[in-house]
């Protein structure tokens, strides 16, 4: 473990961390901690929420559970997630979402509200890259079924 040695040195690029601003982000952190009070871990993979929200939107749009119809609807779908706009890229089916660069800090310095895994250390956002700024040319040559 890195622990205290990583304070103000360790950086991460992530899709989410538990000190992002916003009511929904805070409710994700608190909801997880309330549901699993004995666990020394935290909600982390926001992409799971994104996937379910996009799938629900595709099913609602198509009024179907047909995989092909849902796949086509997913390619057109988007939603406003807790960190910003999220959507699936049509040409390679990759999830596009904001990314955050953050620095490991000591919770006692007052710059963050929540630590990670109850360690007394957490992450403070340095910068945000919106989803549309992450798009690069794809080399994907996905072979799609006709139906």
Per-region residue spans from a language model:
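Extracytosolic ligand-binding ectodomains
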Residues: 1-147
């Amino acid at each position: 473990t890195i622990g205290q040695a990583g304070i103000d040195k360790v950086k991460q690029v992530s899709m989410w961390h538990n000190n992002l601003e916003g009511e929904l982000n805070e409710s994700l952190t608190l909801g997880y901690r309330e549901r699993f009070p004995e666990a020394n871990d935290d909600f982390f993979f926001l992409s799971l929420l994104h996937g379910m929200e996009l799938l629900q939107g595709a099913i609602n749009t198509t009024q179907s559970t047909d995989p092909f119809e849902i796949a086509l609807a997913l390619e057109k779908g988007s939603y406003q997630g807790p960190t910003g706009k999220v959507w699936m890229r049509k040409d390679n089916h990759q999830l596009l979402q904001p990314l955050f660069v953050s620095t490991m800090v000591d919770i006692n310095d007052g710059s963050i509200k929540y630590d990670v895994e109850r360690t007394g250390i957490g992450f403070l956002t340095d910068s945000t890259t919106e989803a549309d700024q992450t798009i690069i040319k794809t080399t994907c040559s996905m072979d799609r079924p006709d139906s």
